[in-house]
């Protein structure tokens, strides 16, 4: 799971940086359009690569059978009391994190008059931290601590990161990014690892449901953060994220106790 995070971190490192450098600090409609066209071209190349290089590993007969029972199995997975709390965790974490992703560029523009170039370097730091966390640090920590404790440390780190941003201290922003990157970088693979262990016969379906939770969280998190940003102030979304995660952590402690009783 950690290596998937490393791959994501590499993209998160160089993608925003390249886009920021191309757009520049004093961006124009033309430079922003160029970034969009380049991103589209890269996606097209990626599509061609997938079509020509990857083969379906699931036999056709099994695929047809899975399609027939897909909806019922999906419902069973979501209703599973051993899995549902972790799906909720994924949803909540990515809802607040995607909200930060959607507002941080506008926030830095209003607070520090930063442009795409400066935000690109912020994303460079975030991506680099995720590579370190998921590619190296996770391997060390997982030998000393179980996934539950690492998820808890991720929550604490996310709460600290969201709390530091509204200070509007330019020197604390890198520290906030480090906290946020550790939080998301350590929590996500640990949750996926737990889901994988608890689903011996339906790993693909369970992990796929987890990724669906991520997508749903982004669908809700970014518009909600934008609404709060516009109507209640630029710092309120980050305070909201921190307080919300504290509430989620308390609820998670309650759920985890129930899970242990059932185990």
Task: Annotate each language-model stretch with its function.
Residues 201-231:
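A late C-terminal transmembrane helix in Major Facilitator Superfamily
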Residues 146-191:
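C-terminal transmembrane helical hairpin of 12-TM major facilitator-type secondary transporters
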Residues 133-146, 229:
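Helix-to-loop junctions at the C-terminal end of transmembrane segments
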Residues 55-88:
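Juxtamembrane intracellular "pre-TM" segments in multi-pass secondary transporters
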Residues 102-118:
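Short amphipathic helix-loop junctions that connect adjacent transmembrane helices
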Residues 24-40, 227-245:
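A membrane-interface helix-boundary motif in multi-pass transporters
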Residues 4-52:
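Helix-loop-helix hairpin linking two adjacent transmembrane segments in secondary transporters
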